[in-house]
C-alpha cells in the first residue's frame, strides 16, 4: 500500500519526503486555506517538485463544465497533477470528459460503495472513501474500504482505492489489511505512526550498554 501525505504545507511535505516513504500528496480547498497567502498554482507545482508521484488538486466548481475547465487548467501545471472532483452526478460528468482527454481524476468525498462503482465506470483514476467521517456517523469506515476493494476485484476494475480521512495510525494498518491501494495521512499521523515507547526504551538501553562496554575496555 502506498502512503500519501494529506496537506498543502510545504514544510510538512519536505520533511515527510525526506523519510523516503511518500508516493504522492493530496490537497483540498480546506488544506489550501490554511496556507495563508499561498498561491494555488505555485503551491501545487512546488509540491510536484518535492514528491515524484500523483498530486491531487481539487476543483471548486459544482457544475461539470466548471470542473472540466478547472481540471484542464490544473493538468497544464504539471504531468503528475490529478484532478479532484466530488462524488456527485456533475462530478461523474466531469470525470468522463476529463478521462477522455487523458486527464486523471481523484473522485473524493465518497461515502458508499455505489458512489465508488459509479466513479470507476466514469473513468476515475482514484476513488477516495472518507473512513474517519464514516466512523463519525456510527458506521465502520473500514467496512466501506473492504466493500469497494471486493467490488473492484470482482469486476477487474483498475481504479485505485485511497483511504482518506485517516485519523490515527491504526487507520493506516486497517486500510492496508482491507486492501486499500493508498492511504493519505495528515503529517501528525505519519509522525505518530513512527513513535513507540518501546523503541525509545530500546535505543536508550542499547546506548547505555554500549557506553558501559566502551568505558570498561
Swiss-Prot record:
Catalysed reactions, as listed in the record: D-sedoheptulose 7-phosphate + D-glyceraldehyde 3-phosphate = D-erythrose 4-phosphate + beta-D-fructose 6-phosphate
One Gene Ontology cellular component: cytoplasm
Keyword set, alphabetical order: Cytoplasm, Pentose shunt, Schiff base, Transferase
Main location: cytoplasm
CDD domains per record: Transaldolase_FSA
GO biological process, one term: pentose-phosphate shunt
Designated name of the protein: Probable transaldolase
InterPro entries on file: Aldolase_TIM (IPR013785), TAL/FSA (IPR001585), Transaldolase_3B (IPR022999), Transaldolase_3B/F6P_aldolase (IPR004731), Transaldolase_AS (IPR018225), TSA/FSA_arc/bac (IPR033919)
Role summary: Transaldolase is important for the balance of metabolites in the pentose-phosphate pathway.
Pathway it works in: Carbohydrate degradation; pentose phosphate pathway; D-glyceraldehyde 3-phosphate and beta-D-fructose 6-phosphate from D-ribose 5-phosphate and D-xylulose 5-phosphate (non-oxidative stage): step 2/3
Enzymatic class: transferase
Family of the protein in this entry: Belongs to the transaldolase family. Type 3B subfamily.
Location within or outside the cell: Cytoplasm
A single MF term (Gene Ontology): transaldolase activity
Top-rank lineage group of the source organism: Bacteria
Lineage, broadest ranks: Bacteria, Bacillati, Chloroflexota, Chloroflexia, Chloroflexales
Amino acid at each position: 500500500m502506498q502512503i500519501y501525505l494529506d496537506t498543502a504545507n510545504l514544510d510538512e511535505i519536505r520533511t515527510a519526503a525526506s523519510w523516503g516513504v511518500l508516493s504522492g500528496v493530496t490537497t483540498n480547498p480546506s488544506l489550501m486555506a490554511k496556507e495563508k497567502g499561498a498561491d494555488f498554482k505555485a503551491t501545487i507545482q512546488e509540491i510536484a517538485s518535492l514528491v515524484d508521484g500523483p498530486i491531487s488538486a481539487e476543483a471548486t466548481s459544482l457544475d461539470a463544465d466548471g470542473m472540466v475547465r478547472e481540471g484542464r487548467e490544473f493538468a497544464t501545471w504539471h504531468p503528475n497533477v490529478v484532478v479532484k472532483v466530488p462524488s456527485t452526478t456533475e462530478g461523474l460528468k466531469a470525470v468522463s470528459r476529463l478521462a477522455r482527454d487523458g486527464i486523471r481524476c481523484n473522485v473524493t468525498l465518497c461515502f458508499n460503495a455505489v458512489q465508488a462503482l459509479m466513479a470507476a465506470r466514469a473513468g476515475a483514476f482514484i476513488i477516495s472513501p472518507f473512513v474517519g467521517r464514516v466512523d463519525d456517523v456510527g458506521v465502520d469506515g473500514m467496512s466501506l474500504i473492504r466493500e469497494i476493494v471486493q467490488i473492484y476485484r470482482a469486476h477487474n476494475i483498475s481504479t485505485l482505492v485511497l483511504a482518506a480521512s485517516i485519523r490515527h495510525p491504526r487507520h493506516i494498518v486497517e486500510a492496508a489489511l482491507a486492501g486499500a491501494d493508498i492511504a493519505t495521512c495528515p503529517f501528525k499521523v505519519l509522525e505518530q505512526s513512527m513513535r513507540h515507547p518501546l523503541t525509545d526504551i530500546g535505543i536508550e538501553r542499547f546506548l547505555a550498554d554500549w557506553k558501559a562496554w566502551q568505558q570498561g575496555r
